[in-house]
Amino acid sequence: MPASTDSSVNALSVTPKNQQQFAASGVRSLLDKMMPLPSAVKTLVLLFGVGASIGLCGWGALSTAVVDYSQKNELPAPDRNLLIELMLALGGTALLAGLAFLARAQQNAARRLELAAVRLSPLLFIGLLPFLFRWQIWVSRELTLGVFVSAGGIAFHASVRASLRAAEEARAGVESPFRRSVAALLERSASWAPITLVSLGAAAYALFFSYHTVQHHRALLTSSFDMGLEDNLLWNLIHGGPFMKMSPLFGPVGSHFGYHATLFAYFIGPFYALYQHAETLLVFQAVMVALAAYPLYLFAARHVGRWPASLIAVAYVLYPPVHGANLYDFHYPPLGVFFIWMTLYLVDSGRIQWAMISMLLACSVREDMAADTAILGLYLIFSRQARPGAIITAVAGAYFLFVKMVLMPPFLHGDQSFLNQWQGLVGRGSHGYAGVLMTVIGNPVFTLTSLLEPEKFLYLVQLGAPFAFFAWRRPIGYLLSIPGFFFTLLGTKYLPLVQISFQYTAHWTAFLFIAVVSNLERLREARFPGDGEGFLRQRAWLITLCCLSLVCSYQYGAMFQQHTARGGFGPYEFGRSETNARRYDQVHKLIAKVPPRAKIVSSENIVPQVSNRPDSYTLRIGLSDAEYLLFQEPARDDERRFAKSALESDFGVVATEGSFVLAKRGHDKSDNQRVLRRMH
């Protein structure tokens, strides 16, 4: 029989059932021929997942129901079906596109498709973006967000690293003209572009926080503790007052030195003298915190290169714990970060004499920053800078012990300041910080119990999530965590120590970024002969850190949105409403009636407005020898009794403006009853 006849007979014998069998066997044959089954499954799953994730991202970006859907799982059935159909459709489209590419059976098509799928794998996470960049979803769910971001960040890093490795293999050592052009551009601009990026970030930070903290102050939202305290100390310092006088806390007699050795105030004095108001300190703080980006960049550039260093410096200005500390009035620890990093850079670059000056300035910021500087010396010892590291540890450690244990207690009649923050670790029969150390060393079970508190777990998550805990990848990270561990985590029942809205985060910020730089540098080292992936490992972590910094800064920080940031004890109020502006004008009309050097006692939020004088007292502590009384109605419970007592004795109402009352000792009391009736 002719061959053509045989073909016709065979064709006629094909049934629909046989067609399905032939198609299935053809697909299996195609897959078996082109790639092993595990690789085929991985490739097709990745393609489907990327398509589905893009669908989820598109729906999330356009839908107005994302918040309710995330928080309550509430979504109308048609919308829910649309979401699933969209994800399946785009996932299926990506899958079919991959199969179509395979069917063409070009040379190395299977491997090329597999590499393409791996290169696209970071897009698996794109579907999360609409959820991560909606702050409403995560209100009161900070721990959930932190754990989610940390775990997702680790997975994202794995996908980025695999993607970079696949890209290298796909190029097979051949650089495209575009990549060569980009590489040449980055190299040509490396002398100026990275430092420009750092400068823009630092300038944006300084301007943003200067403006908003000043506005916050002018909305009467700063407090006697601690804005008024620090403003009064600086005013007395530049006017030749008693050593470290702080009248809002101690009254007419008393020195702040017993609580904190902030000798750095003498450095701030000349700047404060230019404009003797609390606003000067707020601007100074914002600028100093921003300037710390420069020594961090300079140090990092020596170890990981200029471009990566610029990204690390920008991550610093976006770091939420930095924002929280800056938003809470004015404090010294955030200022110390600049000098710790400057000391590190100067030692690292061989400028030892300048490093010693920077070290002394770091110690002068506050006594606890001297302890931090001593730990910096230990890091230098382990970083092959043994001699300068040993000097720094010895000098800074001796300074801390001498100032804290010898010089400061006499100013508090022999007591040790802030021991109450660790009081739970002082055993019966023990006393002072020696008792704390005895418990930490001799009773690890009790110490561990005090550490395992929900607030501390959340605190660590918020500190580490922007890095996916990368800072603790190597033992050096734990050495650098000693200051934060002692000054925050060991605290007992004092919540400000373990909240990112207080100044104590500086003990972590100063060292976690050093650990990040150290770990990134180590990633470049070959792990075995012929290991050429060090650059890929470093780049993968850099990309991960940048992405996580953006997410966490948006959620916890202050610069991208102003709904969730906290400063001090509560949510931070940005801007100045018309009501607050009017209240500011009213209180300053009354302040204008008070002589510049008259002794005045005021409500908590008014003290910072009048603390630039020799004696400005806090009403909730007492009247002391004040000549004037300035308070707001309705008065706080801890202020009302003193204000009422004053008006019932020898203070007379001078004037009222809105809810504010000004009274003077010995003044006519004819208006007192009107005010007293409102106070009952």
Show the residue positions of the predicted features.
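Signature aromatic-anchored transmembrane alpha helix within multi-pass, membrane-resident enzymes
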Residues: 119-126, 196-202, 393-397, 523-561
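Membrane-lumen/periplasm interface segments of specific transmembrane helices
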Residues: 208, 212, 386-473, 477-482, ...
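Transmembrane-helix motifs of polytopic, lipid-linked glycan transferases
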Residues: 95-105, 279-303
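Hydrophobic/aromatic-rich transmembrane helices and adjacent perimembrane loops
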Residues: 82-84, 140-151, 478-531
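Specific aromatic-rich, kink-prone transmembrane helix
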Residues: 295-298, 315, 326, 334-359
